[in-house]
């Protein structure tokens, strides 16, 4: 061969051809083509990465948006099913896993088959006899991945559940830190957090060790296959059946094929964790919302004043066998205050939570201005309500944004009027920025009483037809409570006012007091009437009022 090459070269030189120059030109042209293809491949790779990242980000954004919209529409039934910590994990960590897998699929799953097919086509032109070596390599890789699947797959769901648990423990500790310090139980809470943290760390270490085992095993397979190709190829070269260049090309193409399968297998290993995350997100998205708008909603009368009526209402929580409320019937009229009182756990808060449809009644119906609340859209219903929960809830922003939360288009005069009625002006005026004073997350920089007054002001600024105060005056002192209710009475002359209370003093002057005991109405009337007709109410009053106050009230009735 070498002699033939030398002879041909000498013949070219004899006829005047410069073989050296020709070789140089050929090398330069081929090198330029190779550089061009490499640059094109680099540009295509960068473009593919950018497009994959863009698509992945959009997938993540869409899932977060859909999950958030779904959660916003949850009733209390769904919130009882999914813990807050779990919903946060599903909306962040789980969606991030899905987003990461989406990017990897677009970058690798489309690229790897093309690379594998190209490698197979090239190998078929070099030496088909050693193709069984590539098949052996692929088989070994699949076996390694299958073992990892069997070992690791069941652990991924446990990992996500443990993340939920750790988030729950962290949230409980952070929100309850003042109580923890007051009872000096920091050590116990540290141990509780450490246990959740160690359990998660231990399982993560197991999963990561199993995953770490994969790459060295894959490299061992690749190096072993290279040695096998050299060994088999060496014998073929020795027998004259193969050239050294063909063997080197076969090694390169074989590595290309094996790498493509390796990349697909790596995606396959990521798939179980993302599949668990996708399943958890899907649980939220596909959860059936118990409270939904009717297909053909009705509208409230334009001249309605918000009269609320309960007609033989009974209710039990999902999964519970016994009713929490039994055959509740009453009417709350505009311009009047209807109060609910009773022992702890008698169903007062549950009753008022049925009006905005946080839950739906089990039996009977609730009407506003004669329309069943289930026949209205949730927006139309809640637009008529001003709700103040037991625990004051504030949002990050400032005092003004919190007061005008339900009426963002309201005027400054409406805001100051609401603050004055809620007795919030006295502490707002002490702040340098007054209504622009910042409110930290959850209202952590204001006291419980201030938080409650701002929550009341928020409801007043909305100008609703129906006010619902769910034990909202409990954080106020007696003086503030009295002045606030007096100012509120003047403001709500045309509105329905529903008050859940523990203190008799809060509801003394209510036009209608409903006494609940074990979910049933055991008394209905004014303060003076109930002292004579309802033993349960009398016992509550006797525990809070002096004997002279009781006698005076009973004389007024006489």
Question: Which residues are covered by each model-predicted region?
Answer:
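Transmembrane-helix motif of ABC transporter permease domains
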Residues: 1-60, 80, 133, 144-147, ...
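Juxtamembrane helix-loop junctions of ABC transporter transmembrane domains
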Residues: 28, 37-84, 88, 92, ...
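Residue-level recognition of pore/gate-forming positions within transmembrane alpha-helices
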Residues: 38, 108, 112, 138-142
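Helix-loop junctions and hydrophobic alpha-helical segments within the transmembrane domains
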Residues: 67, 71, 180, 193, ...
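An intracellular "coupling" helix at the cytosolic face of ABC transporter transmembrane type-1 domains
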Residues: 76-77, 93-102, 106, 110, ...
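Helix-loop-helix
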Residues: 118, 122-139, 143, 206-280, ...
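Pre-NBD coupling/linker segments of ABC/ABC-like ATPases
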Residues: 289-303
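ABC-type nucleotide-binding domain
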Residues: 301-558
């Amino acid at each position: 061969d070498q002699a033939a090459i030398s002879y041909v070269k000498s013949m070219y030189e004899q006829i005047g051809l410069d073989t050296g120059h020709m070789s140089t030109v050929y090398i330069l042209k081929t090198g330029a083509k190779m550089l061009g293809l490499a640059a094109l491949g680099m540009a295509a790779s960068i473009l593919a990465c950018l497009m994959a990242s863009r698509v992945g980000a959009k997938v993540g954004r869409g899932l977060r948006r859909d999950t958030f919209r779904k959660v916003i529409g949850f009733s209390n039934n769904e919130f009882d099913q999914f813990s807050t910590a779990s919903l946060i994990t599903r909306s962040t960590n789980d969606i991030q896993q899905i987003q990461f897998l989406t990017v990897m699929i677009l970058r690798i799953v489309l690229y790897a088959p093309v690379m594998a097919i190209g490698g197979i086509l090239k190998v078929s032109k070099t030496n088909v006899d050693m193709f069984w070596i590539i098949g052996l390599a692929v088989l070994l890789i699949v076996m390694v991945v299958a073992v990892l699947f069997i070992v690791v797959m069941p652990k991924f769901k446990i990992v996500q559940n443990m993340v939920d648990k750790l988030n729950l423990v962290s949230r409980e500790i952070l929100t309850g830190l003042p109580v923890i310090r007051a009872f000096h139980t920091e050590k116990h809470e540290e141990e509780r957090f450490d246990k959740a943290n160690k359990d998660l760390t231990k399982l993560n270490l197991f999963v990561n060790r199993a995953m770490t085992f994969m790459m060295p095993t894959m490299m061992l397979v690749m190096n072993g296959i290279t040695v096998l190709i050299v060994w088999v190829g060496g014998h073929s070269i020795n027998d004259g059946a193969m050239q050294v260049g063909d063997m080197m090309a076969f090694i390169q193409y074989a590595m290309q094929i094996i790498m493509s399968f390796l990349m697909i297998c790596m995606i396959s290993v990521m798939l179980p964790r993302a599949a668990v995350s996708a399943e958890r997100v899907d649980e939220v998205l596909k959860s059936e919302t118990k409270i939904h708008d009717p297909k053909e909603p009705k509208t409230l009368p334009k001249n309605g004043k918000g009269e609320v009526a309960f007609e033989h209402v009974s209710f039990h929580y999902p999964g519970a066998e016994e009713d929490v409320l039994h055959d509740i019937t009453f009417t709350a009229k505009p311009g009047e205050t209807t109060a609910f009182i009773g022992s702890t756990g008698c169903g007062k808060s549950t009753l008022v939570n049925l009006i905005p449809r946080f839950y739906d009644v089990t039996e009977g119906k609730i009407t506003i201005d004669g329309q069943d609340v289930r026949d209205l859209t949730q927006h139309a219903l809640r637009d008529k309500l001003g709700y103040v929960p037991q625990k004051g809830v504030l949002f990050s922003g400032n005092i003004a944004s919190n007061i005008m939360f339900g009426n963002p288009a309201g005027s400054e005069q409406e805001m100051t009027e609401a603050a004055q009625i809620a007795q919030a002006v006295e502490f707002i005026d002490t702040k340098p920025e007054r209504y622009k004073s910042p409110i930290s997350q959850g209202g952590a920089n204001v006291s419980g009483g201030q938080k409650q007054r701002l929550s009341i002001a928020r409801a007043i600024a909305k100008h609703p037809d129906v006010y619902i105060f769910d034990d909202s005056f409990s954080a106020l002192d007696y003086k503030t409570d009295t002045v606030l209710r007096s100012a509120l009475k003047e403001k709500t002359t045309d509105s329905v006012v529903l008050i859940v209370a523990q203190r008799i003093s809060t509801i003394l002057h209510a036009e209608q007091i409903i006494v609940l005991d074990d979910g049933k109405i055991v008394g209905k009337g004014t303060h003076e009437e109930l002292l004579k007709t309802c033993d349960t109410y009398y016992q509550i009053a006797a525990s809070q009022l002096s004997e002279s106050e009781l006698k005076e009230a009973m004389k007024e009735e006489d």
